[in-house]
């Protein structure tokens, strides 16, 4: 039986999803970007893999510490926000200075005119991403995205 942490997070889903235990279908790095340019996505994944041995953009579940921090992703009538918890062996990747990495990379592209490997790497270095296996160490008032590397997760209604 899987032991889940008592620390809860929130996630928006595009369509209704049942409560209970689910598998992370992206654990093998199969997630493709929805809005971010593929090349930037791959550069970012490579950086995270070199830093933490995890393709954070392609294999994690994106969550927030508060319902309001994920509500902007639930703007369509079919979307739903759920409370989500993770096994105690999960890894949590985040930066206290980043709310949404996609928005930050989009801003970087507008400022620089183009995205390069060097500019993306420099941006990520400056963001001071960190990894923890202790979800309660993440400040409860942090409103940014958290990328969770896990095989399973548990959903509950909010």
Give short role names for the model-derived ranges.
Residues 77-85:
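Cytochrome P450 catalytic domain signature, combining two hallmark sequence patches
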Residues 14, 85-158:
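Active-site and NAD+-binding cores of ADP-ribose-processing enzymes
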Residues 19, 70-73, 91-94:
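Short catalytic/ligand-binding loop motif for oxyanion handling, primarily in non-cytosolic enzymes
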Residues 74-78, 97-100:
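"Short basic amphipathic alpha-helical interaction patches in structured regions
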